[in-house]
Amino acid sequence: MREATMKRALILIGLLALGLALAQKPKVVIGTGSTGGVFFYYGTALADILNKAGAAEAQPVQTGGSYDNLQLLRDRTAGTTYYCALTTTDSAYVAYTGEEPRFKDRPAKTQRVLFYMYPSFIHLVTTEKTGIKVVQDLKGKRVSTGQPGSSTENLALLVLQGARVKPESFAKRERLPVAEGAKALAEGTLDAFFWVGGVPTSSIVELSQTLARKGDRIYLVPIDPKSTTAQVAMKKFPGLVDPYTVPKSVYNTRTDVRGLATGNIVVCPESLPAETGYAIMKAVFENLDTLRTAVAAAKDTSLEATAKLYGKLPIPFHPGAERYLKEKGLIK
């Protein structure tokens, strides 16, 4: 009798343990970016959507951007904690292939694509009073090329290479995140800064308003996609860096600004369970209006844009994302 009771108790304990294990959601940590940049706000809104939908226990973390996020994905994913990364497509590409120095010895081969977010414009921001009109005018000026090792810095250096402008020719080179770059430009301690980010970027919108109050005006240096200045970046990342035009209404510039943009994607580790990847896709695209209300740049987040990226990158899609896209009839 006692033996039978003990067996029933053990079975009950086992079933309870199994139930708890099944009920426990995977923990998803989302690498975002610096405050003032779109990655930070997008990642925060994404985590909120996943939590409310019950897709995962999601937590956003502030980082230096794409490469930091990809390193977290590669190095910190363990057990039932999965690090997902918001990243530009060019950063994901060179991290996967090992062309980026910090991934040379250990490429981020475990990353898998979930969905496309929006394009990131290569902003070269200055003011009308600096007299900077083209990239070559940066010589002798105080310029920030973005945070060290960031996608902003890497693309800025490619633009400078195309324009035959060496950072050594600057009066002073800074390596600031977008919010600090905008603050320095507004205060007159910087002449221009690069930023690769969504349109609009809140820090640059605020900068435009600040400059207007001071009797100055923001100026985005145009980059002709057909110029040699643009071709270095476009050839480095064929199909991943494309022409893009920022309407004058976005930052209150005098004219629309032609330039270049790279895409942004959400990637996850290969080990993320297929059902969790599917649940993330379902949560995001069933709550797209909520995401777009929270982040203006999310107007470009769509299943169609995600499907267009399928097969364009050497990075495989996550099985959960593939299943969702197939159910919607967007891929075979």
Residue ranges and their predicted role:
Residues 14-23:
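Hydrophobic h-region of N-terminal signal peptides that target proteins for export
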Residues 104-117, 248-257:
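A structural signal for short loop-to-beta-strand junctions that line the ligand-binding cleft
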Residues 44-48, 61-105, 124, 132, ...:
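Pocket-flanking alpha-helical
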Residues 27-53, 116-187, 311, 315, ...:
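Bilobed "Venus flytrap"/periplasmic-binding protein-like clamshell domains
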